């Protein structure tokens, strides 16, 4: 019963307070006459307490109450009195008169929605609510008394005087009111006053009127120790004068607002805003002519001050920044700028005072850290940049305020403090605007670059983002600054971060390289080339993220515009990615895709991009036009299109818009329309279809205005323009000046290159010529007019090209004919397996998620000297390019990138429709060295579910890719590529399918520069069977192998010694002529599988490389036929032996030099006899008495003995025997004539027959007829190193006891004969140490050793 009554009484109180709340919304209404009222009321609620429960009516400041303005309408005395009575009655009902000791409790929250008294009345200002939430206000005292007071007063007066010709009237009105509410230690007070005055005067037809009004408001809220005050003063006045022919009026209004927050210690914050406006109008008429005029003046000022730091930065809400939109007014933007600029100034001042030790409110006093305040400033600036449309203005203004207040200097000082380093770097990354960059460069560039490099070395991704972001901004200052940043390690830090997988970091890297390309100048662009920047741009341009891809393409487009480095840039392959990007993206949509370019670039940045619009490279112009189109849309929204006129970009855009380049002209025309400029006449790319007017427009664009009439008179259209020759231009057009004639021909050649001949070119002649080179596209129209098509192309000869097609350049004719032959040979044939392996690595990957890893592998391998092919063009559905298959056939190594689900589409793909499936099968069929790169997230599918033709790929040794340890992974991959592996593991590999071909990695030490294979035994074989080669070319093949190996050693050392790309290509031209159908991308230095430790110098007879040791002329490699390769395939045992190298013949331990020379002569004779017999019989079986101990023993590099390998293990290591370096004349002297020869074979005697002299290699320093040079001092022998595989040491070197001479002779015969058959095995797994050890033992003195040996051998033979 009592509970119900209490609940009812509380409900009545709530209703009463709700009525007060509604009444507060009504405005004051006045009555006639003079009214003066005063009222006061007090409400007291006694409290009843006991030892168990206390009834405390404690209003909470955090409840939702109406604001201060809602209490201004309490004016009607009767309603207020009535409500007061209701409240008093409600409180009286709470006390039980029968039992004064009753315990009164509040109902539970579940029973009554009214949690406390006064829930319907807001006792706080909104700002007070924020202070309450932060713990600054709020008293926990119990409210036992609520006091409400109200006072109001109104006065009015009016006076009027009227006489003849005169009238005067005056009226005044004053009002004042005050309201106050007290509840415990909460005191809210509101006061308001208003005054109005009006005067009217009329004399002899002239009327004047004056009005004035003043309103003053004041609010005050005290909660605990916090006091908030606010005031608002408004004054307005107007005056009017009017007569028959004249009238004038003037109006003025001013407003002043002020608010402050105070504590017992003083003022925390204070804000003041003052604004005023005035307007004057007049009109006058005289004799029917009237004139009017008006003027308006407005002014506004705002002041904000803070005494010390905000005690709770977490409560500093950024709602006004969040609420700003693209439609926000300018006044709102200015107020926000002023507010936060003052806040930044105050915080920076407090931090500076704290650093000096003189701050009254320090960070330690409030229990915070300095980094928190820096992070708060960072948040403010970050949100300012994010505001749509106005973010550029907001961000720039706040960054300027930070610099002007000394905050930028403070941040640079903090760069050397470990505890504040990162938070300062974060803020620096956000505020490096143009002016701030200049300040940093002038006052502390080294500190900022150092902290940026430190951040990039941190494993935390957030640190890397900040570091690369700072470097991105610093590269946008000047050429000198770019040089300094590069010198301090900024560019190296950016390039290292290109390896990461974090999107934000890669975006900073791409933008940083684009900025460096624009601002760096020619000198810094050379530095970029030396650091292989174009190669590192490839994985960025190949990325899936559009922002990363775009700025990487932009960087490469700027670099390629520099003619000095254009050739190096083209090698990276990035330029091929530009056109697909610009054709698949819309400039306006791309501008909105990322905040990084949502506000556009600065004027200086765009000015440096203007020259790219005039680049000769079509890709560079396409991307530059795309960017200006994007910038035009952004600047139009900002109302800043005049910037394009200031940087002189209008004329450049007009030139591009009228050029025949379809892509660039489209974007340039769109940019001009957005700017508001007229679009010039558009020329189609279909030049053969041009009209006479189009030709005249083109002539005008290239600057030959004086000859436009001549072209008009001759009615030259597009067809005739492409047929013009030098005689026509001189005689018919009248270009007599030779230099002008050259200029016109140059422009005409450029036009022919970019022209579109699709209307007439059904045979794809333009595409065929462009693959040879861009200069060859100029012959397209002439060859089409000559009637050359697919059928006639194979029958074209040199006379036809010169006479019918007008190709007077003999070198161009030769290259075209070679391209025709290569086009015929590119079709699959029976000899396709013998195609020259001119490509080092083919990278296969899944486009959906493997492009980044694949492109990263490409860069790493190219930096280590490998030529790499990666497909960047997306193939059409149902089409598999034959050129891609040919690239796989020409590749020595096939790197398979296995990212998550990379083989998912291959499952049950029996028809071989998947591209990755096709590439794997092509690599298996081509006997490529297949190396899987396995991502950590990749899981192998069940082998049984894979198609049978690719199952064996699951059993290959691979490299587990760990992104954080890239260098180690690449080192292991390089060892695989160069032929070092764990033989035992590979030999024990189980084929994927029983009975199928065993696809195992084939690692030989063939020179990478031999085109047709050094040895003839490179034919196809299946299973474990061996095979012989064409014996007629054995010695020639050995010579080529020795020559190529020496070239490899020499070039590999040059690559390691010199960073210059130009020097790295120094000696490739002589050998590249023997390659077949070279690819455009195969211009990078080819790596070498044989890696020597001894440095081979380029000059000097005593330090000649292996190719200089050749006594005969250089012989081009011979290509063996398929029949020759299959000969002797049934005798696989003969290929299981090694032949001694010259080191083994010269380095017998425990003997004198004379004894070693005598032994060498005996071995030469025995080996030559065995080789002759082997050539006749085509097979040689190993001796049966070989023990198991001999089978398991390993062979050392120096002491080579007669040890037979296991019969079931194929040996596939090419060893440099004495035959590699013996001349044919010397062999003829050593071997006696033999007449018993088998058909189809050649002995050493046959090989000694003098041959037709071959052209001498230019770098050969001696021949067989040259005198023997003097013997220089022999260097110390290097310690023999153990051969290691990626998994560790794969073979051990052990010392052996000397064998009897008879056994040694027999072993020599076996190994000598094995050299005939060793090249035929396709599945051999083991490699020999003799070829690797030969150059180590030589120690740069190989030629001297050879000459010494030959001299001693000849002297021994001639002795009786």
Curated annotation (Swiss-Prot):
Expression by tissue: Widely expressed in larval brains and adult brains.
Deleted gene: phenotype: Severed axons in wild-type flies disappear completely within a week of injury, whereas axons of neurons homozygous for any one of the three loss-of-function alleles: l(3)896, l(3)4621, and l(3)4705 persist for several weeks after severing. After infection with Gram-negative bacteria, the respiratory epithelium displays an over-active immune response with a greater increase in expression of Drs compared to wild-type larvae.
Keyword set, alphabetical order: Cell projection, Cytoplasm, Hydrolase, Immunity, Innate immunity, NAD, Repeat
Start and end residues of each SAM domain: 690-754, 760-828
Gene Ontology process terms (BP): antiviral innate immune response; defense response to virus; NAD catabolic process; negative regulation of MyD88-independent toll-like receptor signaling pathway; positive regulation of receptor signaling pathway via STAT; response to axon injury; signal transduction
Reaction equation(s) it catalyzes: NAD(+) + H2O = ADP-D-ribose + nicotinamide + H(+); NAD(+) = cyclic ADP-beta-D-ribose + nicotinamide + H(+)
Biased composition (Polar residues): 997-1010, 1046-1073
Chain residue ranges for the region called Disordered: 27-52, 997-1026, 1046-1085, 1121-1148, 1192-1217, 1249-1343
Residues of the TIR domain: 837-981
Composition skew (Low complexity), residue ranges: 34-48, 1321-1335
PROSITE patterns: SAM_DOMAIN, TIR
Protein name per its UniProtKB record: NAD(+) hydrolase sarm1
One function term, GO molecular function aspect: signaling adaptor activity
Cellular compartments annotated: Cytoplasm; Cell projection, Axon
UniProt free text on domains: The TIR domain mediates NAD(+) hydrolase (NADase) activity. Self-association of TIR domains is required for NADase activity.
Compositionally biased residues, Gly residues: 1012-1026, 1125-1135
Translocase in keyword set: no
């Amino acid at each position: 019963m009592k509970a119900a009554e209490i609940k009812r009484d509380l409900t009545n109180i709530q209703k009463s307070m709700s009525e007060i709340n509604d009444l507060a919304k009504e405005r004051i209404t006045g009555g006639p006459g003079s009214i003066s009222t005063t009222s006061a009321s007090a409400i007291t609620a006694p409290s009843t307490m006991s030892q168990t429960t206390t009834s405390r009516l404690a209003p909470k400041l955090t409840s939702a109450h109406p604001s201060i303005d809602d209490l201004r309408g309490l004016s009607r005395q009767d309603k207020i009195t009535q409500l007061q009575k209701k409240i008093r009655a409600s409180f009286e009902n709470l006390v039980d008169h029968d039992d004064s000791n009753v315990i009164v409790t509040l109902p539970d929250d579940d029973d009554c929605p009214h949690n406390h008294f006064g829930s319907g009345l807001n006792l706080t200002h909104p700002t007070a609510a924020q202070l309450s939430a932060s713990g600054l206000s709020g008293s926990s005292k119990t409210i036992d008394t609520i006091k409400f007071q109200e006072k109001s007063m109104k006065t009015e007066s009016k006076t009027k005087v009227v006489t003849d010709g005169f009238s005067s009237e005056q009226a005044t009105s004053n009002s004042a009111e005050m309201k106050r509410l007290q509840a415990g230690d909460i005191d809210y007070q509101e006061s308001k006053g208003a005054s109005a005055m009006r005067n009217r005067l009329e004399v002899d037809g002239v009327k004047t009127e004056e009005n004035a009004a003043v309103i003053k408001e004041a609010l005050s809220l005290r909660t605990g120790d916090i006091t908030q005050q606010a005031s608002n003063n408004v004054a307005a006045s107007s005056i009017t004068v009017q007569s028959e022919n004249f009238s004038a009026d003037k109006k003025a209004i001013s407003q002043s607002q002020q608010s402050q927050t105070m504590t017992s210690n003083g003022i925390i914050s204070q804000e003041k805003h003052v604004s005023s406006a005035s307007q004057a109008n007049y009109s006058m008429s005289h004799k029917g002519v009237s004139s009017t005029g008006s003027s308006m003046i407005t002014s506004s000022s705002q002041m904000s001050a803070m005494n010390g730091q905000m005690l709770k930065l977490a409560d500093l809400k950024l709602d006004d920044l969040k609420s700003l939109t693209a439609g926000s007014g300018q006044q709102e933007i200015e107020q926000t700028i002023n507010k936060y600029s003052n806040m930044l100034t105050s915080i920076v001042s407090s931090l500076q005072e704290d650093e000096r030790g003189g701050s009254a409110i320090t960070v330690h006093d409030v229990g915070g850290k300095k980094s928190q305040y820096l992070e708060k400033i960072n948040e403010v600036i970050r949100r300012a940049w994010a505001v749509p449309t106005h973010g550029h203005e907001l961000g720039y203004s706040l960054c300027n305020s930070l610099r002007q207040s000394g905050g930028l200097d403070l941040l640079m000082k903090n760069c050397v403090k470990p505890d504040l380093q990162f938070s300062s770097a974060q803020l620096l990354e956000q505020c490096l605007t143009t002016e701030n960059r200049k300040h940093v460069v002038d006052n502390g560039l080294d500190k900022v670059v150092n902290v940026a490099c430190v951040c990039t070395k941190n494993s935390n991704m957030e640190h890397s983002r900040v570091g690369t972001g700072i470097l991105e901004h610093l590269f946008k200052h000047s050429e000198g600054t770019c040089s300094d940043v590069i010198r301090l390690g900024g560019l190296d830090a950016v390039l290292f971060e290109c390896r990461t997988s974090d999107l934000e970091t890669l975006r900073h890297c791409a933008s940083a390289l684009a900025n460096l390309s624009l601002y760096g100048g020619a000198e810094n662009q050379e530095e970029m080339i030396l650091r292989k920047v174009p190669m590192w741009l490839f994985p960025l341009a190949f990325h899936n993220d559009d922002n990363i891809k775009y700025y990487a393409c932009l960087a490469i487009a700027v670099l390629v515009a520099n003619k000095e480095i254009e050739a190096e840039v083209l090698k990276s392959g990035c330029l091929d990615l530009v056109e697909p990007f610009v054709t698949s993206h819309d400039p306006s949509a791309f501008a909105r895709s990322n905040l990084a370019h949502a506000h556009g670039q600065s004027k200086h940045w765009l000015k440096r991009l203007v020259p790219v619009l005039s680049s000769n490279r079509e890709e560079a112009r396409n991307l530059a036009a795309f960017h200006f189109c994007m910038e035009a849309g952004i600047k139009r929204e900002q109302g800043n299109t005049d910037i394009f006129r200031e940087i002189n970009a209008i004329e450049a855009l007009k030139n591009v818009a009228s050029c025949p380049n379809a892509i660039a002209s489209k974007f340039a025309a769109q940019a001009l329309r957005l700017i508001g400029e007229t679009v010039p006449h558009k020329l189609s790319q279909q030049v053969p279809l041009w009209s006479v007017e189009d030709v005249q427009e083109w002539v005008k664009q290239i600057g030959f205005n004086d000859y436009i009439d001549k072209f008009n008179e001759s009615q030259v259209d597009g067809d005739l323009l492409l047929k013009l020759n030098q005689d026509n231009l001189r005689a018919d057009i009248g270009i007599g000046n030779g230099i002008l004639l050259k200029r016109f021909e140059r422009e005409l050649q450029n036009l022919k290159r970019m022209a579109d001949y699709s209307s007439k070119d059904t045979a794809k002649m333009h595409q065929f010529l462009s693959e040879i080179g861009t200069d060859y596209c100029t012959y397209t129209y002439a060859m089409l007019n000559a009637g050359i098509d697919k059928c006639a192309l194979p029958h074209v000869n040199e006379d036809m090209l010169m006479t019918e097609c007008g190709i007077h350049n003999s070198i161009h004719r030769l290259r075209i004919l070679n391209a025709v032959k290569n086009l015929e040979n590119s079709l699959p044939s029976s000899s396709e397996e013998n195609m020259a392996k001119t490509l080092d690595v083919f990278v296969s990957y899944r486009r959906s998620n493997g492009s980044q890893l694949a492109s990263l592998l490409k860069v790493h391998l190219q930096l280590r000297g490998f030529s790499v092919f990666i497909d960047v063009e997306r193939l059409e559905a149902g089409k598999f390019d034959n050129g891609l298959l040919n690239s796989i056939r020409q590749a020595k190594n096939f790197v398979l990138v296995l990212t998550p689900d990379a083989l998912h589409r291959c499952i049950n793909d029996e028809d071989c429709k998947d591209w990755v499936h096709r590439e794997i099968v092509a690599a298996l069929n081509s006997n490529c060295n297949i190396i899987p790169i396995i991502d950590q997230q990749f899981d192998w599918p069940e082998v049984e579910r894979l198609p049978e033709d690719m199952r064996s790929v699951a059993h290959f040794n691979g490299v587990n890719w760990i992104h954080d340890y890239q260098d180690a992974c690449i080192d292991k991959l390089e060892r695989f590529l160069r032929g070092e592996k764990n033989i035992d593991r590979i030999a024990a590999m189980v084929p994927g399918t029983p009975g199928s071909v065993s696809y195992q990695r084939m690692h030989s030490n063939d020179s990478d520069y031999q085109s047709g294979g050094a040895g003839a035994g490179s034919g196809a074989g299946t299973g474990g069977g061996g095979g012989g080669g064409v014996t007629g070319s054995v010695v020639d093949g050995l010579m080529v192998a020795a020559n190529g190996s020496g070239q490899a050693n020499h070039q590999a050392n040059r690559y390691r010694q010199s960073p210059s790309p130009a020097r790295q290509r120094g000696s490739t031209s002589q050998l590249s002529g023997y390659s077949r159908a070279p690819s455009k991308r195969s211009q990078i230095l080819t790596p070498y599988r044989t890696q020597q430790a001894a440095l081979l110098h380029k000059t000097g007879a005593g330090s000649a490389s292996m190719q200089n040791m050749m006594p005969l002329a250089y012989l081009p490699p011979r290509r063996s036929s398929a029949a020759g390769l299959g000969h002797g395939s049934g005798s696989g045992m003969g290929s299981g032996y090694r032949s001694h190298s010259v080191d083994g013949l010269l380095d017998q331990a425990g003997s004198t030099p004379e004894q070693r020379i005598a032994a060498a002569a005996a071995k030469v004779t025995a080996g030559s006899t065995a080789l002759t017999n082997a050539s006749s019989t085509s097979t040689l079986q190993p001796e049966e008495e070989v023990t198991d101990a001999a089978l398991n023993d390993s062979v050392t590099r120096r002491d080579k003995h007669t040890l037979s390998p296991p019969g079931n293990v194929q040996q596939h290591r090419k060893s440099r025997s004495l035959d590699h370096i013996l001349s044919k004349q010397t062999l003829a002297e050593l071997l006696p004539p033999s007449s018993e020869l088998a058909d189809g074979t050649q002995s050493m005697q046959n090989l000694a027959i003098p041959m037709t002299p071959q052209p001498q290699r230019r770098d050969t320093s001696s021949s067989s007829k040259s005198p023997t040079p003097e013997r220089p001092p022999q260097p110390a022998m290097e310690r023999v190193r153990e051969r290691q595989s990626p998994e560790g040491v794969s073979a051990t070197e052990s010392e052996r006891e000397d064998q009897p001479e008879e056994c040694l002779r027999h072993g020599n015969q076996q190994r000598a004969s094995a050299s005939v058959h060793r090249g035929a095995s396709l599945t051999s797994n083991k490699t020999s140490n003799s070829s690797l050890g030969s150059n180590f033992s030589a120690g740069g003195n190989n030629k001297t050793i050879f000459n010494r040996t030959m001299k001693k051998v000849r002297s021994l033979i001639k002795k009786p």
